[in-house]
A protein has these predicted regions:
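Iron-sulfur-cluster electron-transfer modules
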Residues: 8, 26, 30-188
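Short cysteine clusters
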Residues: 11-19, 23, 52-58, 62, ...
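Iron-sulfur (Fe-S) cluster-binding segments and ferredoxin-like electron-carrier domains
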Residues: 21-36, 61-78, 278-292, 317-328
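A general structural motif
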Residues: 108-110, 176-178, 203, 224-230, ...
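Conserved beta-strand elements of the Class I
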Residues: 112-113, 232, 308-309
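Active-site glycine- and acidic-residue-rich loops that bind
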Residues: 119-124, 238-256
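Cofactor-cradling patches in redox/metallo enzymes
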Residues: 128, 135-202, 240, 247-251, ...
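Catalytic cores of enzyme domains
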Residues: 207-215, 221-243, 256-259, 263, ...
Length: 349
């Protein structure tokens, strides 16, 4: 059985308790934060387990890399404190079961791009940026064979992840992949953060999509024409699992001549899209989600953004229309990069 690599001593010796003190959705002081995280570690009930909006951010805030969010999720499940309504959890668990037979395994013998469960977004990986890069999980009927499972962190179901993920890794490995460019942050976070945290072996090297895009743009540097757009980036929950890769957002903007507007809710202080808050269906959750979304979009607008750049399809689905309704054009990062090299992005709308 895979066990979380959590060290209680790190929490005891921590000087900041930043994992909870910095939380934007729970108001807590340092002393209370220390008490509550230790209660959680000991398997005791805590208001944190009940008030958590599952935004992943404490994984980034923790200065000790002690996996506070993974710990919270495991204890929510152990104490039967579901962050979402039980019918939604069960429906989500059932949705992730692979169906329609086994996928066709094509030998790649090198680098490939993994679409995961976003086979219907193949239009976002077209053009010269992706020339010559084999793609795994292109068939929507078979995409759940490549589903990274990490969505179930939002459901407090670590057991499902640990049960299903080894089979997913085995299926990917059968393609003889050495480097795996992950279309979605969540897939990258799975293989680069979650798997090591529970001692699950990954037989390939995960590569963040933004790192890939940046390096590919460097190769095509002579073709880049500055986009001259003022942009705001909607940072997704899953980006919190790979904070070391977040730097590529600004690096890409600098390379393609996009101006990142100065915002309050940016980088470590970013707000989530509010989708999971609304999905919690608790008293006041809809108003809370609406408030988060309002503050987020007003911040973009007040900063003068022309474009809101997305990486996560769930964030796009949740905020895209709201952003557009505020006069800001929503666009995926890959499409913005295509625009910079003179291509017409299929997803630009």
């Amino acid at each position: 059985m895979y066990e979380l690599k959590y060290d209680e001593q790190k929490c005891l010796s921590c000087k900041t308790q930043a994992c909870l003190v910095k939380c934007q959705y729970i108001d807590i002081d340092k002393e209370s934060a220390k008490r509550e995280i230790l209660k959680i570690a000991h398997g005791e009930d805590s208001f944190v387990l009940r008030d958590c909006v599952t935004c992943y951010a404490c994984e980034e805030y923790c200065p000790c890399n002690n996996h506070p969010y993974y710990l919270i999720v495991e204890k929510q499940e152990a104490l039967d404190i579901p962050p979402l309504p039980r019918p939604i959890i069960q429906r989500g668990i059932n949705m992730g079961i692979p169906f329609r037979g086994e996928p066709q395994i094509e030998q790649i013998n090198g680098k490939a791009l993994l679409m995961g469960v976003f086979s219907d977004l193949m239009f976002l990986i077209q053009g010269r940026l992706f020339e010559g890069l084999p793609v795994i999980s292109t068939d929507p009927r078979k995409m759940f064979h490549y589903f990274c499972q990490l969505m179930y962190l939002h459901f407090a179901r670590s057991s499902i992840i640990k049960e299903r993920l080894p089979k997913i890794i085995k299926t990917i490995a059968e393609h003889d992949v050495t480097e795996l460019v992950c279309f979605h942050d969540e897939c990258y976070g799975t293989y680069a953060s979650y798997c090591p945290s529970v001692g699950m072996e990954v037989p390939f090297t995960p590569i963040h999509l933004f790192e890939y895009l940046y390096n590919r743009l460097l190769e095509l540097k002579n073709e880049i024409k500055p986009v001259k757009l003022k942009v705001a980036y909607q940072r997704p929950c899953s980006s919190r699992l790979s904070p070391d890769k977040h730097r590529f957002v600004q690096a890409i903007f600098d390379l393609i001549g996009a101006e990142a507007v100065k915002r309050e809710y940016v980088d470590e202080n970013a707000l989530c899209c509010g989708g999971t808050i609304q999905g919690q269906r608790r008293e006041g959750s809809r108003k809370r989600a609406a408030d988060v979304q309002r503050r987020n979009i007003e911040d973009m607008k007040n900063a003068g953004a022309d474009v809101c750049v997305f990486n996560c399809p769930a964030c796009y689905s949740t905020l895209g229309k709201m952003v557009a309704g505020s006069g800001i054009k929503p666009v995926f990062m890959s499409d913005l990069c295509r625009l910079a090299i003179g291509e017409s992005p299929a997803g630009w709308r």
